[in-house]
Amino acid sequence: MIVITDLDGTLAHAAWRANLMHDWDAYHAASIADKPNMPMILAVNALSKYCGVACLTSRPERWRQLTNDWLLKYDVLLHHLIM
């Protein structure tokens, strides 16, 4: 079994940067400051012990390193990050 989750608005609280949507680069760059949605992260981490967990995000590939840094900062246990 594979569980699929989203990132912005699911694992990360992203609503605070909605005012930046007119400038996608600024919007995605600001994502490093997103606060974690800890109940969702804890659920994903628990599931990752029993099945594959993939995060499917619409973030562009060029934001992969920033996204990985954020995921590592909050110890999100994923098997795949699909961008």
Language model region names:
Residues 1-83:
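Alpha-helical substrate-recognition element adjacent to the catalytic core
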